């Protein structure tokens, strides 16, 4: 352990790192900026309600959604408000940034509990388009091929819409609500649902490539995809490694608590937190435990992994920075 920073707040938001600073939001609506070097606070900014979503940093601006329904744009260095955009529902997932293919303007795409996905100008904070679903949108919309937005929501449908204009291109029934984000690689979308299934979809045809089912439990974790594997945490306390081609299980690791944390793959290792209060590091090849760090309180957030360092926020309000050897 290199350092820990106590926010004094309940934390569900994941830590995001940019330019030597770590950013995280708290359940009372405070955005903290913390120096990675020494774990000291750089600035803080207060929104009016809680923050569950991880921030997004792009071009010196921090974008963060709040349960007050606003997406805030803050100056990354000083934490000063640039603009805020109002949706009519809680924002529970991070925004994503993209450049529209024809208009060539930088936009943010974010889901809300008002049942809409909103596309917003990064510069002005004004609406570009909205797309209506039939229920809450929880996860981060995924940008695919620089022209499509892929997301699922609580209406049990996976959507592909045009980034330029927000028009529906394809929709696929996925049998149960989706709480997390869709991971896209080489034209295939991978997602876990609330009814024990992890699915792979061909985004061109909308056909299901495979459907991985275990016993009855939901997935709140977003999958990590490598060239050969799909990795996802489950409420069965398992980290599932699925063969990307066949959809069959390659291995499964058992933790002592459920895994809502989305795994991160780095240096042939898989890193994730569990509600058992541990941060785990496994080998990607066979799921053997390399190391684990006991923090003692539930971890539902996704770790931030950068050069020899792992940062993770914990529900007890602490942010922990662990030094790991490069390549380990």
For each feature predicted by the language model, list its residue ranges.
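A short beta-strand motif characteristic of beta-propeller blades
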Residues: 1-5, 40-45, 80-85, 126-131, ...
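Intrinsic disorder/low-complexity signal
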Residues: 1, 104, 145, 164, ...
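C-terminal structured "cap/appendage" subdomains that terminate the fold
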Residues: 271, 279-284, 288-291
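Repeat-blade elements of multi-bladed beta-propeller folds
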Residues: 8-32, 45-72, 85, 89-118, ...
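Short loop/turn segments that connect beta-strands within beta-propeller blades
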Residues: 35-39, 75-78, 121-124, 162-166, ...
């Amino acid at each position: 352990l290199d350092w820990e920073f106590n926010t004094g707040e309940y934390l569900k938001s994941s830590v995001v790192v940019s330019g030597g600073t770590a950013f995280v939001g708290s359940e009372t609506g405070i955005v903290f900026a913390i120096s990675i070097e020494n774990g000291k606070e750089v600035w803080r900014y207060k929104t009016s309600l809680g923050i569950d979503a991880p921030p997004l940093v792009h071009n010196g601006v921090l974008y963060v959604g709040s349960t007050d329904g606003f997406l805030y744009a803050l100056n990354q260095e000083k934490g000063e408000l640039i603009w805020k955009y109002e949706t009519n529902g809680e924002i529970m997932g991070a925004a994503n940034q993209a450049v529209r293919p024809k208009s060539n303007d930088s936009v943010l795409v974010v889901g809300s509990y008002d049942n809409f996905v909103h596309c917003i100008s990064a510069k002005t904070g004004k609406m570009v388009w909205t797309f209506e679903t039939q229920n809450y949108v929880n996860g981060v919309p995924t940008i695919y091929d620089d022209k499509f937005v892929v997301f699922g929501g609580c209406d049990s449908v996976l959507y592909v819409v045009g980034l330029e204009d927000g028009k529906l291109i394809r929709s696929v029934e996925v049998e149960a609500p989706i709480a997390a984000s869709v991971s896209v690689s080489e034209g295939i979308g991978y997602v876990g649902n609330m009814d024990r299934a992890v699915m792979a979809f061909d985004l061109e045809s909308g056909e299901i490539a495979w459907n991985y089912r275990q016993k009855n439990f939901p997935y709140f974790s977003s999958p990590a995809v490598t060239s050969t594997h799909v990795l996802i945490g489950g409420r069965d306390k398992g980290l599932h490694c699925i063969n990307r081609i066949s959809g069959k299980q390659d291995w499964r690791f058992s933790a002592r608590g459920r895994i809502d944390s989305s795994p991160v793959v780095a240096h042939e290792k898989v890193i994730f937190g569990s509600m058992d209060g541990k941060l785990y590091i496994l080998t990607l090849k066979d799921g053997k435990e390399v190391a684990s760090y006991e923090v003692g309180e539930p971890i539902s957030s996704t770790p931030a992994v950068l050069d020899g360092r792992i940062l993770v926020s914990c529900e007890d309000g602490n942010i922990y920075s662990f030094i790991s050897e490069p390549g380990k």
